[in-house]
C-alpha cells in the first residue's frame, strides 16, 4: 500500500527482502529450513488484500509435507501458516475473497477467504505429465495442465494460467456465473 517492494529469494537464501519505493533496502526475513517460520523455497508471493490490514501471502513451494502458504505482516512478522498440502505452490493471485494458487504438479487450487479449497482446476491425473515441463504440444489437453507456474485474474473474474512448458502456454479460464 505504501509502495514498498518485496522480493523472494527462494533459490538461494530463502530470505524475503523489503525495499522502499525508491529501491532502498529496508529489511529481510526468513531463512532456509522446514520449521514453522522457515522457508524451503519461498517461491512466489502476493499482497493478500482479502484481509485488513493487507498482508503478504507467501508460497513455500518445497516445504514438507507437500508445500504450504504462509501469512506475514508487511513488516516481516510471522502471522500464520495458512494451508499445507498444496503440492508445490508456485505463486498466488487474489481477486475479491478468492486466491488462485498454481501447483507445479499440474493444477490450480482456488481458496476462499477462510482458505478453504473451493475448486481444483485443470488437474493432470497422469503422473508422467503433471509437473513435467517437456510435454510436446501435440499432447496438450485443453483445460489440463502440466506444470502451472503463474496465474492472474482479469476484471471480469476470468483466470489466466501460465503452464510451465518447454514451448510455453497460457490458458484463459472463463468464469462461469452460477
What are these regions (language model features)?
Residues 20-24, 73-77, 112-116, 174-177:
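Short loop/turn segments that connect beta-strands within beta-propeller blades
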Amino acid at each position: 500500500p505504501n509502495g514498498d517492494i518485496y522480493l523472494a529469494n527462494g533459490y538461494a537464501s530463502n530470505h524475503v527482502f523489503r525495499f522502499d519505493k525508491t529501491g532502498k533496502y529496508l529489511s529481510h526475513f526468513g531463512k532456509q529450513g522446514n520449521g514453522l517460520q522457515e522457508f524451503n523455497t519461498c517461491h512466489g508471493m502476493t499482497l493478500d488484500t482479502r484481509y485488513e490490514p493487507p498482508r503478504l501471502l507467501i508460497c513455500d513451494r518445497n516445504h514438507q509435507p507437500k508445500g504450504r502458504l504462509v501469512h506475514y505482516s508487511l513488516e516481516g512478522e510471522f502471522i500464520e501458516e495458512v494451508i499445507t498440502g498444496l503440492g508445490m505452490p508456485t505463486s498466488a493471485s487474489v481477486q475479491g475473497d478468492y486466491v488462485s494458487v498454481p501447483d507445479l504438479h499440474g493444477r490450480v487450487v482456488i481458496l476462499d477467504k477462510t482458505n478453504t479449497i473451493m475448486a481444483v482446476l485443470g488437474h493432470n491425473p497422469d503422473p508422467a505429465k503433471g509437473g513435467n515441463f517437456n510435454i510436446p504440444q501435440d499432447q496438450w489437453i485443453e483445460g489440463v495442465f502440466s506444470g502451472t507456474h503463474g496465474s492472474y485474474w482479469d476484471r471480469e473474474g476470468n483466470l489466466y494460467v501460465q503452464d510451465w512448458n518447454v514451448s510455453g502456454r497460457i490458458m484463459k479460464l472463463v468464469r462461469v456465473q452460477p
